[in-house]
Structures are given as structure tokens and as C-alpha cells.
Amino acid sequence: MNEAATVLGTADIQEILKLLPHRYPFLLVDRIIEIDSDNSAIGIKNVTANEPHFTGHFPEKPIMPGVLLIEGMAQTAGAICARKTGGGSNLVYFMTIDNARFRKPVVPGDRVEFHVVKQKQRGNIWKFHCDAKVDGQLVAEADIGAMIVSKEDV
């Protein structure tokens, strides 16, 4: 772990489980290696061959569905929002997706890094620019919006 990540903050799987309501098979962030307050984060997803979506996408040439890359970005952004606004006492709803682009396939054995950067925040609405990278190469990108809602209001 580098010194900057220690200063900025990290989240292991136990903390992620406290921040996000997602569970297997839909929890798509294994670890967060860097969190800069409410401004940015880098989440990690270790892609393995035994994930359920690979049985049908595609049996002879498994490729991680692009929608799951977007969801991993959203979960990383959601962890920032949840951590900043009271942890597990709130829900973070994924609201919008714009400018999504998929550049390269993600396959079993890849380690995806979800880089999310807050673009703006107004009240309980947050906007992020997100990149997904494998071995430093851009594989997907999108702009996403999220809304924070108290669990009591749901």
C-alpha cells in the first residue's frame, strides 16, 4: 500500500459491506484502494472465471458484460457517497448514465480498477465521471448520477 493511499483512505471488503447494500452475486467492488474524502476513489474488482454471468456471456469466450462495468463504477461512487453521508444509514440510488463507452473487453483474470471523480454535488444529487481500467488501459467510461436517500424515507 502506498503512503498516499494510507493518508487518503481505503476500504476493505468488510467496510464495503457496511457502506453498500449489495451482496453476492451483485457486489462488484472487492476493495477500495484509495478514497479522497468525497472527491474521488479507486475501486478494485478481481474478475474470476466462476462468476455466474460468464456461463451465458459468452460460453466459449467469456466477456464481462458492459453493464456490470457500469455497475462497478456506480458502486465505487456509491461507497464515496455513503461514507461521506453516514455510512449504512443511507441508500445511494444510481440515477443517470451518460456518455458510456466500452473500449476493450474484460475477461476472467483481469483486475479492473474503477476510477471515479466527483464532478459536482447539489444537495443529495451527485455527479461523477468514471473510468474502468485494466493494466492501466481504459476499457470503459461513463458519467453517472446518484441520489442519496435516507433508509427511513424508503
UniProtKB/Swiss-Prot annotation:
EC numbers on record? 4.2.1.59
Q: Where is the active site?
A: H57
What's the protein called, per UniProt? Answer: 3-hydroxyacyl-[acyl-carrier-protein] dehydratase FabZ
Subcellular location(s) of the protein? Cytoplasm
Reply yes or no: does the keyword Lipid metabolism apply: yes
Q: Which organism is it from?
A: Sinorhizobium medicae (strain WSM419)
InterPro entries assigned to the protein according to its UniProt record, in alphabetical order: FabA_FabZ, FabZ, HotDog_dom_sf
Q: Which family does it belong to?
A: Belongs to the thioester dehydratase family. FabZ subfamily.
Q: Cite the CDD domains for this sequence.
A: FabZ
Give me the reactions it catalyses.
Answer: a (3R)-hydroxyacyl-[ACP] = a (2E)-enoyl-[ACP] + H2O
